[in-house]
């Protein structure tokens, strides 16, 4: 073999090796939705995450978004290697993880009362369960893998009139419904109210301007979205969790080393208490007079109503039955005395 041919082959081999190294060392682009963009709490948590992942050999480049539709679309079209957004948007990439953010699925009723601490314990155990390597199959759909779950807080009913204090009084009222979560409109219609098309960029504006009578939102949104304007002197926030919301991270698995998704989920599981601290601070920041409480009878009745609605919506194909089955098991682990734990509801689907 001639020297020139040998050198040529060596050159090609070197180019292949260097290309592989360059590809491995390229920064991974993360699109991060936060209602406050790059100044928000989630974005700040993600900066710490990036430092932690660098120790695992992955260098992350963050880009903040205030519109999660744009963030998820940039991810879907390959402009980002990973995205963080609410479960409503991430559900298109993994419906099992998206089952966390479903009507009443994580709510615990104990001794006839809503147990909010117990409800968050369900979310904690779910996040721990899905952080396990054994859950990788459930967390993966095609090239997409859920690589983090972060609690955002309970979605509470927020109304512009305190007289709207029962389900019956919501009949005919206008309620914001996200276009990309079809289950919301289904539920609103079930109670005889009127769904008004909205998304995360404008639902608060519609409430503050009086275009809708009710929205559901976590307390973390109260100050940034200036919800006090819509609540005014006559409105309030009902201390009844319609669901507990989560931020979720999903990656394109082809862009990351094997096993990265598990390491990432484990990291975010370790940040649960940090996220809860932010939620508790936001809860404490709501003026005491703004809160409204349901009777124990109605709290239990509405929880059962949400359960019936959740099952119906799952039968319509809008919720993932596998995910709901996992959540049922964890609810019954947290509160085994609940009568539902003696039934096969949400376990044996027909």
Protein language model features and the residues they cover:
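Short helix-initiation/N-cap motifs at beta->coil->alpha
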Residues: 61-73, 179-182, 194-209
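A ligand-binding cleft/hinge motif common to bilobed small-molecule-binding domains
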Residues: 84-98, 204-208, 216-234
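Sec/Tat signal peptide C-region and signal peptidase I cleavage site
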Residues: 21-26
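Bacterial N-terminal signal peptides that target proteins for export
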Residues: 1-12
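Extracytoplasmic "Venus flytrap"
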Residues: 27-47
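Contiguous mixed-secondary-structure segments that line small-molecule binding/active-site clefts
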Residues: 76, 88-180, 185-190, 227, ...
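Bacterial N-terminal signal peptides
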Residues: 11-20
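Alpha-to-beta junction loops
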Residues: 75-88, 174, 194, 209-218
């Amino acid at each position: 073999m001639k020297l020139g041919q040998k050198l040529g082959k060596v050159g090609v081999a070197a180019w292949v090796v260097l290309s592989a190294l360059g590809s491995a060392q390229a920064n991974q682009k993360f699109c991060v939705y936060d209602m406050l963009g790059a100044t928000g709490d989630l974005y700040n948590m993600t900066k710490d995450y990036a430092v932690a992942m660098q120790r695992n050999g992955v260098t992350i480049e963050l880009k903040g978004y205030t519109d999660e539709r744009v963030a998820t679309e940039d991810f879907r079209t390959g402009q980002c290697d990973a995205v963080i957004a609410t479960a409503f948007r991430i559900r298109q990439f993994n419906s099992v993880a998206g089952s966390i953010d479903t009507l009443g699925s994580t709510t615990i009723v104990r001794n006839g009362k809503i147990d909010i601490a117990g409800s968050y314990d369900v979310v904690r155990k779910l996040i721990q369960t899905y952080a396990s390597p054994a859950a990788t199959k459930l967390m993966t759909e095609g090239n997409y893998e859920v690589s983090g779950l972060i609690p955002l807080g309970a979605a509470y009913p927020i109304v512009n009139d305190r007289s709207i204090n029962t389900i019956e009084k919501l009949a005919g009222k206008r309620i914001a419904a996200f276009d990309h979560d079809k289950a919301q409109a289904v539920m609103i219609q079930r109670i005889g109210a009127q769904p008004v098309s909205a998304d995360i960029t404008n639902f608060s504006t519609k409430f503050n301007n009086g275009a809708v009578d009710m929205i559901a939102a976590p307390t973390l949104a109260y100050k940034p979205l200036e919800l006090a304007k819509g609540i005014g002197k006559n409105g309030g926030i009902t201390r009844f969790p319609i669901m507990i919301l989560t931020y979720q991270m999903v990656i394109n698995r082809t862009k990351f080393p094997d096993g990265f998704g598990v390491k990432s989920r484990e990291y975010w599981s370790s940040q649960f208490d940090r996220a809860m601290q932010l939620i508790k601070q936001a809860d404490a920041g709501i003026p005491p007079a703004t809160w409204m409480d349901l009777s124990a009878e109605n709290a239990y009745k509405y929880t059962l109503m949400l359960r019936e609605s959740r099952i119906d919506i799952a039968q319509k194909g809008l919720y993932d039955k596998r995910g709901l089955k996992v959540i049922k098991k964890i609810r019954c682990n947290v509160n085994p005395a609940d009568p539902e734990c003696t039934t096969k509801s949400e376990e044996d689907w027909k």
